Amino acid sequence: MSIKLKQRFVPQLAAINYQFEEDFSKMLKTVDTSHIKEKTVVKGQVIEIKNDMIIVDVGLKNEGRIPKSEFLSLPEVGDVVEVFIEKIEGRNGRTILSREKAVKEELWGQLEIMCSKGEFVDGTIFGRVKGGFTVDLSGVVAFLPGSQVDVRPIKDPTSIMNIKQPFKILSMDKKLGNIVVSRRVILEESRSEARDEMLSKIKEGMILEGVVKNITDYGAFIDLGSVDGLLHLTDISWGRVNHPSEVLEFNQKVKVMVIKFDEKTKRISLGIKQLDSNPWDAIKEEFPVGKKMTGKVTNFADYGVFLELKDGLEGLVHSSEISWLKSNQNPRKMLTIGQEVEFIVLEVDTEKHRVSLSIKQCQENPLIKFAENNPIGTIIKAPIRNITDFGIFVVLGNNMDGMIHEGDISWEDNGTDLLKSYKKGDEIECKVLAINFEKEQVSLGIKQLSPNPYQKISDEYKKGTIVKAVVTEIKDDGLVVLLNNKVTGFIKRVELSDEKDEQKPEMFQVDEEIDAKVVSIEKSTGRVLLSVKAHKIAERQKTLKEYGSSDNTTNMGDILANVLEEKK
């Protein structure tokens, strides 16, 4: 059953308000209805409620129908309501009205006024879209860009959704129906006053409570209410912390101390470890240098391994202090996390908060024992562990190796070629040549088991001796010569003459005899190095010394001419 009003309703513009409903019809008779246009808001009277529809008369030829769902509270027959005219005459000749759009039009007008005055509007974030969020402004949907959500990135946006909160309108476009709002502007304005007030009270040494707002590799930012402070990684604990996330969580409440405040930049440095006494104050007494202790492996680094000395305190064993004989090996290959090892305290640096430890010094240095039993010159037998391009490694016991360089295999033959005649596992005899305790190396030799065949040559051809040499081979870099038909010598190109244009090997012939001075002897090969240039210079100096004291009128040319004549 429906209730219908018999009296016709006369149109009225939305701008006109009447105090009494009973005068409504009479007043409308004098109003010009030609102003009623589509896409405008007008007042209308509810004349009938039928099923799910509200029938409204706005004074036009036809009534309009509006779904009940568009009304927040249902009107009664006779009530005057504001409606939006979609079309004066739509399909079937009916006027198309909307209560929802009328409300939005009214709200849009209110929002425009608030925007022009810079006033805040209440809204609720209810959805996520590309680039930001959607906000319900009591029926009008606005866009909240991601950059305008907060003063800092928010990891969990659900914490600010579906909550009524203030926003500031940044821009409005009625034609496009777009509204852009900001939450960040309000936060900045509200925080600004509180920030200035708090900064005026901040002092170093203050203890404050805050919330972890962001975690980075180098520390965490703590929200102190209206300002943020940085809690650096090194100020979290007196012990070792590899990453802040090991001990801190997002939104975790923490107690911190202001350890530094820069009044110019307004930067606040915070610390947690400063709330406790510095354990390093008593470290030197508790861990004296030379003390032998035990500890567990807690962490590895490229340069060594960390051991736990006690709760919250670690010491470093450098790679070179792990083993006497494996200083270059990866610590991870020698130790495991949680393994308990014995160590000695080497140094305690209270300023840098470092404790240096040694594992190897808890054990006897096997190299010292080897040196005591096998001094330099000792002949030993040892199996071959490995053969490389540059020599042979043999086993000396106690995980210790000795090395025979390829140059110490033979006096006369090529060591590189001789390496092929040895194989892994062969036991060979060799002599201890040198022991380097700093580098932890033992040098051995095979050729030193027999006398140096070139020592006799060194004794016979001493440096400075003038000898006669016969050319046996002409090379680009010099001449190969033979001394006394048994010893090989060599004259470098630059040693062929004291005149540069005569330093040419091709100027000599095979079997030509040359006078030269012994410069040196290669002990590894026994080859004698000679110099024609040095011999000529010595001859010239000798001549000048012999004839230089004669008549001063005699010139150099005369002296040399006389010498040459005498030699003929």
Curated annotation (Swiss-Prot):
One of its GO terms (biological process) is translation. GO terms for molecular function: mRNA binding; structural constituent of ribosome. Residues 39-100, 118-184, 205-273, 290-360, 377-447, 464-533 form the S1 motif domain. Pfam families: S1. Keywords: Repeat, Ribonucleoprotein, Ribosomal protein, RNA-binding. Belongs to the bacterial ribosomal protein bS1 family. This is Small ribosomal subunit protein bS1.
